[in-house]
Design a protein with these regions (language model features):
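N-terminal pre-Walker A segment at the start of P-loop NTPase domains
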Residues: 1-16, 136-139
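Post-Walker A alpha-helix
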Residues: 38-40
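Conserved P-loop NTPase "ATPase switch" module shared by AAA+ and STAND
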Residues: 67-94
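Conserved glycine(s) of the Walker
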Residues: 33-35
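Acidic, divalent-metal-binding catalytic cores of TOPRIM
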Residues: 88-89, 122-251
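Structural recognition of the conserved hydrophobic beta-strand(s) that form the central parallel beta-sheet
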Residues: 83-85, 104-114
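Post-Walker A helix-loop "phosphate-sensing" segment adjacent to the P-loop in P-loop NTPases
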Residues: 44-55
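Hydrophobic anchor at the beta1->P-loop junction of P-loop NTPases
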Residues: 27
């Protein structure tokens, strides 16, 4: 299954509308933002049909996958958008990751966990928010927003480049870095980026990585940066010379 699919899920109180672009989409966010409600509405529509009071509009079937028999159920589903809530612990397993990569379905995973076995794009990590649409009615209009923007201006002038790749990509950025008198180092894989960042001194660092597969690493790479910087500032007792932050750039 390929291409973009628009999904609309609504009843007399709630209206969800969003586009699914890739085979793996992640929805994150705090409690009470409407994530579980979306799953419940889809489940009601699937089990009760028109009697549920829920309308699901999409050009492909939308299904909810859950429970201990998930693998057996998944084998019978094809060319559908499958929604899975975070209470289903199987989404963290290698077995599930293998099943996802060998199927023709799209998957919408509602979880705050980092799913390291799945290669999902940083551009397909979303949150949910209520928009101003329908604000004069009783219906709440829910839309998705990207957590990590695809347009960023680096707030620093990097003194060191760390590249996820160790092959031609690294060779390119090493050549560019040499021209700019910058140090360039390969992490030899996305899973080693975080550990390498922790070993860097107070220099400003720019990370170059493949945005199409680094989604699971983004929480670790972005959130701790300021904390690491503050800790180094305290350790050296030279706040004015410490880094003000570390930026991660996805290409």
């Amino acid at each position: 299954m390929k291409g973009l699919h628009k999904v609309i899920v609504q009843n007399n109180r709630l209206h969800y509308e969003f586009d699914i672009r890739r085979n793996i989409t992640i929805i994150q966010g705090n409690s009470a933002t409407g994530k579980t409600t979306l799953i419940n509405m889809l489940r009601q529509a699937e089990n009760l049909g028109a009697d549920s009071g829920v309308d699901v509009n999409c050009d492909v079937p939308c299904r909810v996958l859950e429970g201990r028999n998930w693998k057996v159920i998944l084998e019978s589903i094809s060319k559908s958008i499958i929604f899975i809530d975070e209470e289903n612990v199987f989404i963290n397993t290698e077995e599930f990751a293998s099943a996802v990569q060998n199927s023709d379905n799209y998957y919408v995973l509602i979880t705050r966990e980092n799913l390291y076995d799945l290669p999902y794009s940083v551009e397909e990590i979303y949150g949910l928010h209520s928009s101003g649409k329908y604000q004069n009615t009783r219906k709440v209009y829910q839309q998705m927003y990207r957590i990590y923007s695809d347009k960023n201006i680096l707030p620093i002038k990097p003194e060191k480049i760390i590249v996820e790749d160790s092959n031609s990509g690294y060779d390119f950025f090493r050549s560019v870095s040499e021209d700019q008198n910058l140090e360039c180092e390969s992490a030899h894989g996305k899973t080693k980026l975080f550990d390498l960042l922790q070993k860097v001194d107070t220099r400003q660092v720019c990370v170059i990585a493949d945005g199409a597969a680094i989604g699971a690493e983004m929480n670790r790479l972005s959130a701790p940066a300021a904390m690491i910087s503050r800790w180094r500032s305290w350790r050296t007792s030279t706040p004015a010379k410490s880094a003000t932050g570390r930026s991660s750039a996805a290409t």
